[in-house]
Amino acid sequence: MSENIKNKIEELFHSTPEGVGVMLGNKITNGEYTGEESIVFTVEKKKPLSELSPEEILPSQVEIDGVTYNTDVFETGLIETFACPSNVTSACYSWQYTPPGNRQTIRPLKGGVSLTSQNLQGYVGTLGFLAVDSATGALVGITNNHVVIADAYYSSFRSTTGILQNETSDSAYQTGDIQPSSSSLKIGEVLRYVPLSAPPTMNQVDGAMVSISQSVMSDSESFKQFGLSGTSVMPFATTSEINALVGNSLTSSSGRSTGVKQGPLCGLAIQGVNYVTGVSGFNLQGQSTVAYFNNCISFTRLNPDCQWPIYPGDSGSALVATIGGVDKIVGLCFAGGSTVGVACRIDIVAEQLGIQAWNGTTPEFVDLTSKKLVTVAGFNNTKTITCSGQTLWQVGVINGVRIC
């Protein structure tokens, strides 16, 4: 995908009304993907043309690099983060009346299972998959920052008069559905996350990393996704493979709330791979805020008119696609509406969070006694600093000084 197309999509996002998302995707007609590449606008709710103000009318065609694209408008509901209050009780929709097994305590640990943290008691999301920390070679668990981090914004967006939160100490628990969480459910500790920026700055990743205790995993089982049929190690898809995903109907996921979504009846389909949208529900010093994201994957049920490709509590789950006969992780799910899910691209997650795919071999494990905390004066938007040869990640705001 050319930079001109990406730039035009962001230009359209900023020039359209609040709440409109934009992507280059697959046109939908009568509830089916047509295969026609088009500029897709997503809206919370469609309205008759007669009810739209002049500013709300979207273009019927868009020209980019001499190519004219027809446009499509797709109703999504409100796009929001999908961790959920842990007391929410909920064919393809059996999860609405029979809680899926993803919510149980799963040992050995696998991807797709219920997760929470000490700093976010009262909420629950999904442990997406196990990966390798590129810096240490240690086995780690991957989820969203809004699943385990109380306030993931860069400190530069915070005020001394607001709530000051940090991740100096934060245990991770599986299952996340039994709260208050007991020590017997602890699987590790939160290590780091990709900090968020407030609008108009764009984000690409809602991601966090937790350590994994050797006692809760297995070399032969923990690379699997709970309930999915695949039994082989899943590599990360490459950038070119993700760019070619639009229309892929061999897409699946397993999450805490909706359970397994796989196969010709209950599977998923990729709608676009460069989605630009605002996402509500991020906590900034106790206030729910909107963050802007670009270069995201949007996905639907195989029938795009069917609801809930993702649901509150599924945040952090892996998005898996079959590419060349091989199941690969293509994204990290983090948001959605009633008819669309949104995932961070795994190539960007890997780069910004500093991870590699786990190949299933016996791994190293994080030595939690080696965790180090330092402080720097003032607020800033620096993700990492180097201290005594170590790379340290921003993890919030604290009163006090422990200078590097």
Question: Where do the model's predicted regions map?
Answer:
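Serine endopeptidase catalytic core focused on the charge-relay Asp
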Residues: 96-304, 312, 321-323, 334
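Structural recognition of the beta-strand scaffold that forms the well-ordered cores
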Residues: 40-42, 141, 318, 331
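Short, solvent-exposed mixed-charge patches
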Residues: 1, 403-404
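Short, solvent-exposed loop/turn segments that connect beta-strands within catalytic domains
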Residues: 29-35, 133-138, 323-328
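Ser/Thr- (and often Asn-) enriched beta-sheet segments in non-cytosolic proteins
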Residues: 63, 68-70, 80, 94-96, ...
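C-terminal subregion of chymotrypsin/trypsin-like serine protease catalytic domains
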Residues: 298-302, 309-310, 320-387, 391-392, ...
